Amino acid sequence: MSTKTKRFILPESEIPTRWYNVMADMPNKPMPPLNPATKQPLKASDLYPIFAEALADQEMNQTDPWIDIPDEVREQYKNYRCTPLVRAYGLEKALGTPAHIYFKNESVSPVGSHKLNSALAQAYYCKRQGVTNITTETGAGQWGAALSYAAKAFGLELAVYMVKISYEQKPYRRSIMQTFGAQVTASPSMSTKAGRKILTEHPNHQGSLGTAISEAIELAMSTPNCKYTLGSVLSHVTLHQTIIGLEAEKQMEMAGEYPDLIIGCFGGGSNFGGISFPFMRHTLKEGRKTRYIAAEPDSCPKLTRGVFRYDFGDEAGYTPLLPMFTLGHNFAPANIHAGGLRYHGAGVIVSQLLKDKLMEAVDIPQLESFDAGCLFAQTEGIIPAPESCHAIAAAVREARKCTESGEPKVILFNLWGHGLIDMAAYDKYLAGDLVNYSLSDEQIKRNIGELDAIG
């Protein structure tokens, strides 16, 4: 009879009471967002017309390391937290690796992903301020599903702009959003000025997160008592996601180990930051030697092949200018099935950390990600979301290095969600119909060159 522990479970009483703000401990703080017209730094109050005031304050807070989690949000967290930390014995055996592989299983949330951690917080702060309507964008639909759940929980009306290619590829996520009462529109659409402009110039545009953000912001700015919310990129979103890593810290203690490597897939940064930043505070404050690896799709390689500079967070240029690693806000990503990772830029915190060489980034081809996802499903019994497959692929790469070197390193990655509503993507993979998309240096150079107009 085996005495090995597979899952490490914290009781409900151990749900964290505070989120961790890594900016307070960073040696170089992220540069400020700028007003596009004046190029002057923004204050939190400048963001109040778009975001709930508490969220704008969190966005600009670079001094307080800990932010209290409201009781109302913690009560909602009790529906699914604490989430399990799992030792991937099956994957280890299949790889023949001496590495110890752990994953934080965020797929157990009511909507199947980590996105609910911030959705509940953002909906709460909007409700507390007296807001009645909120808008958002969504790529693969994970964020839209989470926010639709949260909006219903706190009595808010929600309008979602869903990237067109995902709207078509993932109809059941659209159904989930509509089940919770959200209005869902394929983006780009004819319902906004930004959408109409893009469709006039590119009638067959398949959509991007940058485009959907533009439409959601435009609707929020033109609707009374309405605020915009978003699922990644900005610092307050990543703040809420640190509940993942804070729980994982305690669970790794239960396992009697500490990670040598921490891996998260990367679209805008909230998932990666959520698992890694609570551990990173020990690197920043105590010099703890841990590697932090962001795994992005090679078809959208903002961290590995982009440039660090100020850029808009959306295609139409409605957002402030943000200091980020970017491929250019006009970048049109390939129609990969990891819809949640199809974004042109990186969040300001991750961008600064990468610039300071406190973390690493790798790019993963689409087929390699699905290879890893299927291996994980076959060995651990969970079909991962296509986005999470990128983190698994990066973990597999590192585990194979351990096989070659004989080093028993401890690897931790975040399984951000399950893929049970992404089976059309797996169908195409299994039929041999998926391909890799690679960008030429010339394509990237041309797109980044358009940023010169920003100044």
How should each PLM-predicted stretch be described?
Residues W143-Q206, K302-E315, M423-A431:
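Active-site-proximal loop->helix
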Residues A121-V131, A145-E157, Q178-T179, S276-E286, ...:
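Alpha-helix C-terminal capping segments
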Residues S118, C126-I165, Y258-F272, Y292, ...:
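A short, small-residue-rich loop immediately preceding and capping a beta-strand
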Residues N105-L116, I134-W143, L234-V237, I263-G268, ...:
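Active-site nucleophile and cofactor-binding loops and adjacent substrate-binding regions
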Residues T3-V131:
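Positively charged, low-complexity intrinsically disordered leader regions
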Residues F266-G274, Q366-A424, K428-G432:
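Claisen-condensing/thiolase-fold acyl-transfer catalytic domains that form or cleave C-C bonds
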Residues W66-D68, K197-H236, I244, A255-G256, ...:
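Active-site/ligand-binding loops adjacent to catalytic centers
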